[in-house]
Amino acid sequence: MINVKEYSGHIRNWSALCERLGIDHSLSREDREEQILIKAYETWGNEMADHMHGMFAFALWDDEKQELFCLRDQFGTKPFYYYETADGELLYGTTIRQIMEQPGFVKELNEEMLQLYLSLTYVAGEMTFFKGVKKLLPGRYL
């Protein structure tokens, strides 16, 4: 069984995906998009982003494989962050605050990122202002 653990966004080609994946159009937007994520993952696996258009970031848990699959849209419109604790546990969320509120997070300033930002006034790549917290890059999965 696959569960949506985290989701932020909107799938623009939802109607075509509902047709292709056999999902009821009359479901609420929230239920419909959850079903799209689950069925798209079951159908296309890691390649599901190739079939989806919109702005989204999400995490799916596959009970059978005991795997977490996280994906961010191709343009990076919706953010997705992750952090590995000292115990090797993966914390994740669509906001850094979600990660900060979880046990095991160590709040520490990323001085290297701060120096880059003050020099360039731009936050590039996967680094954030918190040490160990990374952004999932646009169009990438984890």
Where are these regions (language model features)?
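Cysteine-centered catalytic environments shared across enzyme families
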Residues: M1-Y141
